[in-house]
Structure formats: C-alpha cells, structure tokens
C-alpha cells in the first residue's frame, strides 16, 4: 500500500510540474496558448544594451516569428537572389547557428510591399519542426527532424493572392492544421504529423483571402478550433473538422488571430477587409449563431494585421497605422487609445504586463487597465516586423537582420 501511495505521489508531482515545463516552450505562432501570453514571471521589464544576452545575424529576409523547444530556436528565411526558402536552427543558449536547411526553391510569388517570402511561423512538437511556404501556386508543407533532416514534404493545396503568403500552421495532438484563404480556393487542411497525409479538409466556398491562424482552446466545455475565413467566423472540432457553430460577417477577409477572454467566456475576432470590426462571440452555441451569440461589436480599435491580446479582462489591440487601444473585453467599451507608431508585430504579455513593439523596433511596456499606464520602454535598434517569443525568462525578438535574446 505504501509502495502504491509513493508511486501515486510521484505521478502527481510529475503532472504538477509538467505544465510548467511545457510552458517554457514557445512552440508555434503566439506561443503555447496561441494568444501571445506567457506564464513566465521572471522577465525583464525595462532593459538596455546590458540586457542583450546575444545578438545573431539572420541571413536573407523574412517576417516569421521564432519558435522555441528546449534548447533550440527555429526560424524561417528567404534568399530572394537564389529563390530559396530556408529553415534555420539556433542554439537558445548562445545564439549559435546550428544548421540551416533549404525547404524549396521556386519562383518568388506576388506579394504586398510590406510582406516577405518567409512570413509563416514554424511549429514544433519537440519531435519535428513543421514549415510552410508558397512555391509557385502551391502551398508546400514540410517536416524536419530536430537535427535538420527532411522527414516529409507535401503539397497541401494551392494559393493565389496579390498580397503574398503568410498563414502559420498550428498543432493539435497528431495533426498539423493550416488555414488557407485564397482566390484559387479557400480551405482548412489538417495533415498527419507523422507522414504529411491528409486527415481532413474543410472547403470554403467563397474563396476569400484569409491569413488568420486557427485558434484552439477549450471553450464552453469542449475543445474548439476557431477559424476566421471566408466571410465568417467558424468553430470546428479539431479532431475531425466537424462544424460546431458559425457567425456570418462582419467582413470578407481576416488577418489577425482570434483571442479568448476567460473571465467573460467570449472569443474575440477582428475582421480586416473591407471593414475592420471586432466581433465578440459566446462560443456555447451550435449551427448559425449570427443573430443569437454575437455579444458585442466594435469598430474602434479593430486591427487589420496585428493580433490583439487579452490580459485580466482588458483587450489590447493596435492598428497597423499605430494607434493602441484598450477595450473592456466583456463589453467592447473603449477605455483609452494612444499613438504607438506604425506596426505589424502582435503584442505579447507576461506577469500582467503587455509588451508592444512598433515597426521601428521600439518597445512599450504597458499595464492594462482603465487608464493608460506605461511601465517602461526599450528599443532593439533596428526595424522589426515579426512578433516575439518568450521562454525561460528571456525575450526573443527578430529584427530586420538579427535575432535578439534579452534577459534581466
């Protein structure tokens, strides 16, 4: 009996510690919870040159965010001169480039002047690293080992847009899921992580552009995958792609990612084009919930590209033009707004603070609340359009030419 009790105690301790260990990884776009938040409480608030642990050169160009697993950082880049798209691996400890592997070589796609050819953030489960690029009119997805060996590469579908490609994949159990909104076909595709074969596919009939990453969270008592695409906001079962609910509108296209407010139980999404509107939806419904579960709508503060963030019941968003807004998440009431500088990067949060970076690499640290409260400021010293990552008390920022590691 004592032996059994001891084993149960050890198991309980392991299960207690495991979430904390997992939280140290930043495995995909916007981190472990997909919303830009970190449980890390040991991060620097204000910093200068003395807080830069290392600064490593990044070859080529790209706007993808770094992802982190254990002692490794993964990043994508493109070499326009040779038309190569590349996966990079750095050592988290000192920023040393451990390896780089070409993913594909293909003609450069059409894109917006502010977009790049390596804008999709990788995803990793600690066994493989998954990347996606546009090659010609094909969406190519590849999986590499942690040591940089190609495991598989598949065509997931086609893509056509004047703005270029930038959809980031997310992981759910043994599936890699990608939202592709394209003029040549709009769809959500789930691939098996082991071999890249298709697990399921959701076709979207309107063929509208979408760049929003799927958001997976337990809401209203069940796991839901919220996808903003094709003139609507929809929730699916990520296991099999079955539709749970949908809310039509408020616009045709979406770029920023959904977020969730635990306090009010609302999932909040902003449309991008032709109208920027926040929708806050109660995710407990089924079928068409357009007229029954949309709790509030708000035009002011709705972002085009940067994803918003929720901290302690406050919704912070920043427009591409550079106006930072704070809304009450449960009601959509705008509490304040403040000029912050034009930006594409999405904010992150930790320890009750929000870290927001504009395109100049200027970082403002804010305590969300009913009035604007700036806690600190910092600067990278170079242009930066990528969203940062957080792991083990350190920030990882991608600038135009370098990857920065910042600590206390």
Predicted regions and their residues:
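Bacterial N-terminal signal peptides that target proteins for export
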Residues: 1-10
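Generic C-terminal helix-cap and adjacent flexible tail
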Residues: 3-4, 20, 407-408
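Bacterial N-terminal signal peptides
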Residues: 9-20
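Noncatalytic, solvent-exposed loop/strand surfaces
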Residues: 23-408
């Amino acid at each position: 009996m004592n032996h059994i009790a001891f084993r149960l105690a050890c198991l309980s301790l392991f299960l207690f510690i495991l979430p904390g260990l997992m939280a140290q990884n930043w495995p995909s776009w916007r981190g472990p919870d997909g919303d830009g938040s970190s449980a890390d409480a040991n991060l620097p608030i204000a910093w200068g040159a003395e807080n830069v642990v290392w600064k490593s050169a990044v070859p080529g160009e790209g706007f993808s965010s770094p992802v982190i697993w254990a002692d490794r950082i993964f990043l994508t880049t493109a070499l326009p001169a040779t038309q190569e798209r590349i996966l990079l691996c750095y050592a988290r400890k000192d920023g040393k480039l451990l390896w780089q592997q070409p993913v594909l070589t293909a003609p450069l796609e059409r894109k917006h002047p502010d977009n790049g050819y390596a804008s999709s953030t990788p995803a990793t489960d600690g066994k493989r690293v998954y990347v996606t690029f546009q090659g010609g009119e094909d969406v190519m997805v590849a999986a590499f080992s942690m040591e940089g060996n190609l495991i598989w590469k598949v065509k997931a579908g086609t893509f056509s847009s004047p703005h270029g490609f930038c959809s980031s994949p997310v992981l759910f159990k043994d599936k890699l899921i990608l939202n592709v909104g394209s003029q040549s076909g709009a769809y959500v595709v789930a691939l098996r992580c082991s071999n890249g074969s298709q697990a399921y596919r959701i076709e979207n009939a309107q063929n509208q552009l979408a760049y929003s990453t799927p958001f997976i969270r337990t809401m209203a008592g069940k796991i839901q995958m919220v996808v903003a695409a094709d003139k609507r906001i929809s929730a699916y079962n990520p296991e099999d792609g079955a539709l749970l609910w949908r809310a039509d509108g408020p616009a045709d296209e979406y770029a920023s990612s959904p977020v969730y407010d635990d306090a009010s139980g609302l999932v909040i999404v902003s449309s991008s084009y032709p109208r920027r509107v926040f929708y806050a939806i109660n995710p407990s419904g089924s079928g068409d919930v357009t007229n029954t579960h949309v709790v509030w709508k708000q035009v002011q503060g709705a972002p085009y590209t940067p994803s918003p963030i929720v901290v302690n019941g406050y919704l912070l968003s920043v427009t591409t033009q550079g106006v930072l807004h704070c809304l009450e998440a449960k009601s959509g009431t705008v509490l304040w707004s403040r000029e912050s500088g034009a930006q594409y990067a999405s904010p992150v949060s930790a320890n009750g603070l929000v870290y927001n970076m504009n395109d100049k690499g200027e970082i403002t640290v804010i305590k969300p609340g009913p009035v604007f409260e700036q806690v600190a400021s910092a600067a990278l010293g170079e242009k930066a359009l990528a969203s940062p990552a957080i792991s083990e008390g350190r920030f990882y920022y991608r600038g135009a030419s370098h990857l920065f590691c910042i600590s206390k």
